[in-house]
Amino acid sequence: MRPFLDDAKRRVDRKLSARRQSLSASRFLPSALPDRLKDNHDAQVDFTAPPGGSGSREGHLQYMQQSIFGMIAAVGSRSDFHARFDESSDSDGETGQRPRKESSVRKGTSVSVNTSSLDPSQRSSSQTDGNSEKDLGTRGRRHRRTISDHKLLRPFMSNSKHEPDPSTGDEMPTVSPPSRPRSATPRAAPILSRMVEAQAQFDLKASSTERSQSSLNETGAKGPRDASVSPLSTRLMDMFGFDKPEKVLVEYACSLLQSMLLQGYMYVTEGHICFYAYLPKKSTVAIKSGYLHKRGRKNPKYSRYWFSLKGDVLSYYADPSNLYFPSGHVDLRYGISASLGDPKEKGREPRDFQVTTDQRTYYFRADSAMSAKEWVKALQKVIFRTHNEGESVKISFPIESIIDIEESPMVDFAETFKIRVIEDDDSYAIDEYFFTFFNSGREAFEFLKILINDQSLKISSQHLSPQPDRSPRSDRTRKSRNRWSLTSGTSRAETQRKRSASTSHMSLAHDIVKSSPATRHQDSSDSILNSFEQATESSAAWQSITDAAESASQILNRSDVFQSPTIYGLDRRPSGRERRGRRNSDETARSPSTRVNVGTGQQIDELDRRTDGNTSGREARDTTSESDQYTQDPTKSFSGAPSLNELVKAGVYPLQRAAGLAEYLRTRSKQMSNLLASESMGYIEKVSGMWTGGRKHYGEAEDVLPDDQDVDPEDKEDGCNYGDRFRAHFALPPTEKLQATYFAYLHRVLPLYGKIYVSQKKLCFRSLIPGTRTKMILPLRDIENVEKEKGFRFGYHGLVIIIRGHEELFFEFRTSDARDDCAVTLHQHLEAVKFMAESGLLAEQEQNESEAAMTEHRMLQEARYYDYGENDLRPLNESSELHPIFDDPRASIVNFKPAESLRITCLTIGSRGDVQPYIALCKGLLAEGHRPKIATHAEFEPWVRKHGIDFAPVEGDPAELMRICVENGMFTYSFLKEASQKFRGWIDDLLSSAWASCQDSDLLIESPSAMAGIHIAEALRIPYFRAFTMPWSRTRAYPHAFAVPEHRMGGAYNYITYVMFDNVFWKAIAGQVNRWRKNELGLKATTLDKMQPNKVPFLYNYSPSVVPPPLDYPDWIRITGYWFLNEGSDWTPPTALSEFIHRAREDGKKIVYIGFGSIVVSDPSALTKTVIESVLKADVRCILSKGWSDRLGDPASAKPEVPLPSEIHQIQAAPHDWLFSHIDAAVHHGGAGTTGASLRAGVPTIIKPFFGDQFFFGSRVEDLGVGICMKKLNVSVFSRALWEATHSERMIIRAQDLGARIRSEDGVATAIQAIYRDLEYAKTLARQRSIASSTPFSPTPSAKTAAEQDADDDVEDSEEWTFVGDDTDVEMSRRLRDRAISDADMLPDRLLANSVPGDSGPGRN
């Protein structure tokens, strides 16, 4: 084994080892493996092989361990099922648009500029900049990189994220216009793209320089602030960008009203009216989920889906248990409105609603009108949040710009008035703001009315003047009007820039727009200018013409947001990327700053020029309005009547629509010619590359790394488009950076060819086969492990993704290199995500995003406190605590604890490990005031009663069955012969004794291995729960614990193992159980379908951190946590054991525990010798519990005991909770209780499974990375496992983390609360079973004839045990109840008088 350079490389190389080693491929050696631990000649020998020649798993026998149910387990473990495919995802028949893709400008991406087509100023700018290209370095093989230099961790490892290339000049500035990513299709003409990019960079540099100079001038002009100015005035000046502090006249707590309330503060100063609201951080949990009907794009039929509103995306799924494969999504970041539909009938509220985005309108139908309202409200909240990427909302407008104020009553308990404000002196666009006051509304209205009237004469004279003065004050005021600052905590210059520039909800640093005529063309009634020029102003007349519905998002981008896509910003000029999408090839001769305004039906080309040195480029652009009106010459007079202007605009509206349609048709007619001219051969190469397969890695700027194979230079130049298309495909935020892509097959029902995307936090897949729409979005935090497997098809190479609580995913690659590279990349990202989560970096990063807004909010409160004092502030603070639009929909937990004490019986059979969890549970029930009782084997009675728990005996000691297994081997001919003679009587005794032990019970909790509980609960008419230590409920996530395959087989195999096991086990005992039901319980014969055991409430007593709850588990199945019985606190260790541990610590040696229980092997001496040699070879100290020496295998080959060296100390017994807390690693057989104890102690666990559920828990330990599962036990394998478990820092840290999580759980308390919560549901099932059984309460023979009894037995009532609530179920229950009463009336009176002792009749429930 070659030496490794560091920990990460060692793990990766171990993972990618082509040779299948005896240790799992999911583990990596922590450091250089000593030469003594190399494989020897015994590497393929298993010294735990049982006696006899009967083969089973891997050619060896399996053993009964801990549970009676092991006899049936061999059926599952020997079964061979090959159904390994999942169902294909459903589709609603919609087809997605594929607009044109465009080039993007990113930081670190080189851009070639054709300077011949630019003006001299542009050429000089572009020549000065040059081509700046970030030095990405040589990537080499991906798995060679260490964690420290991984791109996910670089922001945390270094303060400098981007460094300039020393070979070039200044680094190219970042161009990040407000944008929307589009899907992958051809891009526009490269020449025009480069022209626009060069102009955009030039404008950005110029505006940055001007802003800096302006900021310096303003600072110098202001000088020091007046010390007499109040802190509140100073704070408002900084927050809203005023020229000087303005005295605060009055302030009110109010709400900005649109379709919802945004609560904040109104500050009235000498010159402005300001509104400020602090927004809480967006939640990452699902806001709302449930079933809805969705209409297709072209198909008017509604299809039912499961919808989940989480973050900014509304996703819908064909199967609610398969949440990694959405059928589609609605990206609400581009949402415009959410509103209810028109009622179809008078007097009935509508159930339909629609969501309008910039792309299309989605139509939904809820099950009720109330549900539709709730969905609309939730969607409106999300749309509002998505338009506010910052943590605060600010509005300020000069008092001189207010036209009027009028009352607008909305509700009786609040005062609402409307303020109309002129947006701009150039355009006369008018905005309306509604403010609602719950207190002091009349006072605020009168105050503002007087203030506005005082300014009315001044406002009129200003607007009627030929040309207003463009003083710095007026320019500054005009720029600050009605601007929303969505980012807080920045410098004042930055705040001014964000106010004057675009502040749309997609103005993020690296989000690039890709617009096309197909996407710009809207079916709704928005302006046709959107097809080629984005309008940014609005008016009241315009709203009345378009009749657009307002929504909460209107308050962000003013009223014109509903006549234009919200993805466009508020820039005075369109960005280069928008402009490029609006032009075609014959427009390349124009300057990139050319605009098209349709005012009189003609196109007017106007160049943006910088007129003089005193006017900045941005201010020059501000003089020209891009609104839907006439193009005005700056020297002409403006009309003094806004109403006349609005009428003119209304009249020109048809001409605008016609001109826009002509532009749209002209652009589309030349689109194909542009594609063929610029991308003639590129598409052939890309399509061929797609089917050939391969991989690509992307750098910091999401450009293709230079050392990837088959990289097209043009792809490198356009590399940042990959990340944008990736985010557009899966509706991911701009912060999700693309890292690598692969072409592979996803195995579900059939192999589905597509593309794998690996990003910082997500693993995504998208099908590329025409006619398929499968998408997968899998968070990396949900991935437990990644393993290599053989492909399902010859010549292909498999990769298995193991997911928490979900079935495995199978991918096939054409080449092993691509598969290995994908495995390495995923492992690196898993390590990075794990590192960031453990170190708290993710939380810190998220917290930093809101720190600035919180600080600003706190400083504002402090300033208010300073000015007004505590008494004046208290009413305002109290009202500000209410956030009606951000309320938490989750209700508080209700206490379901029953008022009376319950008699609870716990029925279980098996070994000590089966009884111990019930003792812990009953101790918790005793503390709750209940009267528990354990019904199990008589040998455990002293142990149970020692804890103050009542006891009832159950026959059928499993020792007899264990003896049969030991003496005959599992499922040999002699075993079947003896079991057929003795096992039937064993079951009869078990059933009869269990029926007697469960009398006088109000609730029955049973292990499924006891077999009798569900029938006893039906006879007693009492609620029934199940509890077990291993998975027993049908799921696609895990196989049955007794049917774990050698290799991953997929969800279909996992599910069918439960179906097979249930049927095999029931068939074996059905005859005896039905006979017992008739003779002793007085019940009819039943079947597996009639019992419906999968509807029974189930409690699993293992940790959800060890076995996460599968996504397809129903609500009544709960994983509660381990039920530990802590007995170690009262145990005193022997002196020899304490001295052995103390001596090992002094010597600096690791201590391991080895104990396999009472197993039977063919050569116990050889096994003992193997353990001794492995311990010595690994150089550890061992505490040994040698159970296999108690019962030798072949008496003829008996050998003397092997003497133990001083490094090994043998014990007979010790409490696990005490012993495992004093060791460094544990080695055992993998029983449920022992595994839980070692994991709780936080020590690495080595499992050598022998039988049944031990294979399942061994695989879980390995998947979690906290231990090793050995398939064979020999010196080579065992010594290496011991050394790795005691030296692997990765494994030790993971085990400690898992142990801390398990110790923080309270499984008993959780189980008791689950019992309380599901008790009413269990009572409902008990009532339905009693009705369906149609028997009296006494187990007395019926008076019916044999023919009548047989007829009743043939009744198919498998659908009768369903939920109560639907009309059909109610009718069915009524008929069954009537039939039961009729049957009871036919019985003799003496039968009705008899009842089982302790039964209280049908009213017990």
Swiss-Prot record:
Subcellular location: Cytoplasm; Preautophagosomal structure membrane
SUPFAM superfamilies: PH domain-like (SSF50729), UDP-Glycosyltransferase/glycogen phosphorylase (SSF53756)
Predominant location: cytoplasm
GO CC, any one term: phagophore assembly site membrane
Listed Low complexity bias regions: 116-126, 1332-1348
Segments forming domain PH: 285-384
Keyword Lipid metabolism assigned: yes
MF-aspect GO terms: sterol 3-beta-glucosyltransferase activity; UDP-glycosyltransferase activity
Region (Disordered): 1-27, 83-186, 203-230, 461-526, 566-642, 1330-1367
Ligand binding (UDP-alpha-D-glucose): 911-912, 914, 1214, 1216, 1229, 1233-1234, 1253-1254
Family indicated by similarity: Belongs to the glycosyltransferase 28 family.
Protein name (record): Sterol 3-beta-glucosyltransferase
Organism of this sequence: Aspergillus fumigatus (strain ATCC MYA-4609 / CBS 101355 / FGSC A1100 / Af293)
